[in-house]
Amino acid sequence: MAHGRNIRKRTFSDMDTLSDKNIGIHTNSLPKNLLCRRILFKGKISKYSIFNDSLAKDHSSNRSMSIDGLIGKKRPHDISFQNMNSSMPSSTQKKTRILDEEIKDQSSSNENDRDSPVIVTLKPSYMPKTSRITEIIHKMKELNMNRIEDGLSFNKKRSEHDAKNVLLHTMEMEEDCEIEEDIAIDSPYLNTSLSEDDTESIVETDYSEEEKESISETESSSDDESYSLYDSF
């Protein structure tokens, strides 16, 4: 039974919290001016999370200390919210800072000014993401504008180059046409058509009567052969 009583003494009954599931720093252990702050600390308090100075003050509770942590020991009063704030992540620190400033603004405002929006001023060390995003957007716009200008200048140069090529090509074609006209003027017999008189004179000349008779005989014989071949079919 004695052993059981010792175990009962080492339970969480001496703690300031209402239940053993939600173990944290109670509001009674904090100063009065910090009661409006929200405590975001939950879980067991081990001996490594409490300073050695606070443990050395209370020598009577050393017997109830175990290896895993503090069981049956009251929380020291010298744990301040700043120490808790230093152990918090940066996101929770920003949230608590904004909540504190909103509470101060609401307490200092009059009844008529309660509906007015609250302006939260943060420390200069905190840089919002929106400003960084706007800077990136402006830089992207500048880059795109530079690219567009470069593209326009390139297209302009290319169009000018194409226009020069077209002019050169047309000039070369005109020169070729002029050369052909000059050749036609120099040799007019190339493009002139022969008349019937010219053809007769050309055909009838340079043949004797004997040659003409032989030619006519060969033509008549060839005509007879062609007719005979046609009749056979």
UniProtKB/Swiss-Prot annotation:
<feature type="compositionally biased region" description="Acidic residues">
    <location>
        <begin position="195"/>
        <end position="212"/>
    </location>
</feature>
<keyword id="KW-0244">Early protein</keyword>
<feature type="region of interest" description="Disordered">
    <location>
        <begin position="190"/>
        <end position="233"/>
    </location>
</feature>
<comment type="similarity">
    <text>Belongs to the asfivirus DP238L family.</text>
</comment>
<protein>
    <recommendedName>
        <fullName>Uncharacterized protein DP238L</fullName>
    </recommendedName>
</protein>
